[in-house]
Regions:
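Extreme N-terminal starter segment of soluble prokaryotic enzymes
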Residues: 1-3
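C-terminal helical "tail/cap" subdomain of flavin- and related membrane-associated enzymes
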Residues: 21, 296-413
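Glycine-rich FAD pyrophosphate-binding loop
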Residues: 20-41
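Conserved mid-domain beta->alpha element of the FAD-binding
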Residues: 5-21, 133-134, 247-328, 332
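Conserved Rossmann-like nucleotide-cofactor binding loop
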Residues: 11, 36, 139
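Conserved N-terminal glycine-rich FAD pyrophosphate-binding loop of Rossmann-like flavoproteins
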Residues: 35-53
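Conserved N-terminal helical subregion
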Residues: 48-165, 369, 373-386, 412
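Conserved FAD-binding catalytic core of PHBH/FMO-like flavoproteins
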Residues: 105, 128-249, 253
Length: 413
């Protein structure tokens, strides 16, 4: 099969790797419009479930990724004016640029033709391909050409956020919340290589405007943020990968859904097909899962239309719950003042429960009361709820047992 992948992110590269491993006779070209080594963001975060998927589908690149990743241990939630809370958990961070380098090197070693500075803006440029894989991100040009068939919907979130980095080490995944004269502002931080940590800053638009962050020059905005988070940075500075017109590249998260993921011989994967809010930390894992699922569908079916239809249905079903929880998580942070007025342990419980549909629909105190009642009911082995499992999803699978008993491997970011 002749395959053209447009976009050399994790989804496009890993699909090429898996397909080439399954059948070396496939002719696969990956087109990337940017020069080699170009990337956005700093580090990405993942857990053992992704490593297991990588080891199953390509042990060689999985081992390299595991060797390059930086483990972090535990999570910390630090609300200014209250004692920090610690949560037992663990995961990994890795430099996004290094992750892409590993995947490019592996793809090349398998015989994939990876072409940088190769811009594909029209489907006619890859018309000779049997299969065209659009892995060109949330602003996919290829998707735009078939918008009437894919029927994408993009919804911009309310909060402002920016991906920064710092030389301050964060050995635990850390949330820090700081009040300002314009409202609350917070960060999510984790180490991704020795001496460098990702530092994502988020706030409501009123806080962003009130602090002047949208109008300041990049250097002044960084100094303002360094001052706000001085206790956490401990003398270390903040770094931005780029600025637009001497301004920091603040964003509003765009949630993307498509009615269908394939049209004729064009199929969407990764951020071209879907996005999930960064506060659930699933973007890289979902991109890899798309790649593996597409390769599997192509191997299982003897016709391209049936394979693409099976892939689309399988992944859209798998994504439905994740996307719903991501929306709830984003909305929780957009309504932070509703929750942060509670003491630190209660706030942490609400943070862990942010994917609960019930929490969104009722006052926090009512939710906490019902959750306590539910916990007591299910504590007894004789309880009917305990025997059948009960409506756990309504109380948040991570929150129903409280902070210390939250399920392992399901962090609060």
């Amino acid at each position: 099969m002749r395959i053209s992948c447009v976009g050399a992110g994790p989804a496009g590269l890993y699909f090429a790797i898996v397909m080439k491993r399954r059948n070396p006779n496939h002719e696969i070209v990956v087109h990337e419009r940017n020069p080699a080594g170009t990337t956005h963001g700093w580090g990405v975060v993942f857990w053992d479930d992704l490593l297991a998927t990588l080891r199953t589908n390509d042990p060689d690149s999985a081992q390299t990724i595991a060797d390059q990743a930086v483990p972090w241990s535990g999570q910390v939630v630090d609300v200014e004016g209250q004692p920090p809370l610690h949560y037992v958990d663990g995961g990994y961070g890795i430099c996004r640029r290094r992750l892409l380098q590993i995947l490019v090197e592996r793809a090349l070693a398998l015989g994939v033709d990876v072409r940088f500075e190769s811009e594909i803006s029209e489907l006619s440029q890859v018309a000779d391909a049997d299969l065209i894989v659009a892995a060109d991100g949330v602003a996919s040009r290829l998707r735009r050409h078939r918008a009437d068939q894919f029927r994408p919907q993009i919804e911009a979130g309310r909060n402002k956020y920016i991906w920064l980095a710092t030389t301050q080490p964060f050995p635990s995944f850390t949330f820090g919340f700081v009040p300002t004269s314009a409202g609350w502002i917070w960060f999510h931080a984790y180490s991704f290589k020795e001496g460098v940590s990702t530092f994502i800053v988020e706030c409501a638009p009123e806080t962003w405007d009130g602090l002047g962050l949208g109008t300041m020059r990049a250097d002044a905005a960084l100094k303002t943020l360094e001052s706000i988070f001085a206790k956490h940075l401990d003398g270390h500075g903040l770094m931005s990968r780029d600025g637009h017109g001497n301004r920091l590249p603040w964003l509003s998260f765009r949630t993307l859904v498509n009615r269908t993921w394939h049209a004729d011989n064009v199929v969407l994967i990764g951020d071209a097909a879907h996005t999930t809010h960064f506060t659930i930390g699933s973007g890289t894992r979902l991109a890899i899962d798309d790649a593996v699922a597409l390769a599997s569908a192509l191997s299982e079916h003897d016709s391209l239309p049936r394979a693409l239809d099976a892939f689309s249905r399988r992944r859209q079903r798998a994504l439905a719950r994740v996307q719903r929880e991501a929306r709830l998580s984003a909305e929780w942070f957009e309504n932070l003042p509703r929750y942060i007025r509670y003491n630190a342990p209660t706030f942490f419980t609400l943070l862990l429960a942010r994917r609960s549909r019930l929490l969104k629909r009722m006052p926090a105190r009512t939710y906490l009361y019902l959750r306590r009642k539910y916990t007591k009911l299910t504590a007894s082995a004789a309880s009917p709820l305990a025997r059948i499992g009960g409506p756990a999803h309504r109380f948040g699978s991570k929150a129903r047992r409280g902070i210390s008993g939250a399920e392992p491997g399901t962090p609060c970011h």
